[in-house]
């Protein structure tokens, strides 16, 4: 899916593409990033296993949102499916202020989780266009939705 941001204003604007996918508040989320790249630290229980950082949905009932500097992909496994998103990897200075390439938001009511991907923060002159692509993959999987090499390897079959 390719998005375009068009600056129709008469002045220069700073923008960053941002895509949110809402998923059920269950299952497991994982992405390629060291746990120390997650901010704020300690807000959600992430572990590093099988070459990825994992968040298995927990019982906490607070609004929580983390930022992470990943490698341009994240995955979510639940209910027999694996959802993978691939997008441009950002350098550490590319995200918008106070933002990150990967964001995970869990709402207090535990009714959904937002998986967010963000592109580079850039300046658009009047009339300029920014295009940004996010590729989605949906695969069957038969794990118990816990961190596993099987899930990590399955992502590798579509993201090379």
Question: What are these language model-derived features?
Answer:
Residues 1-4, 16:
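Short, hydrophobic/aromatic alpha-helical segments in well-folded domains
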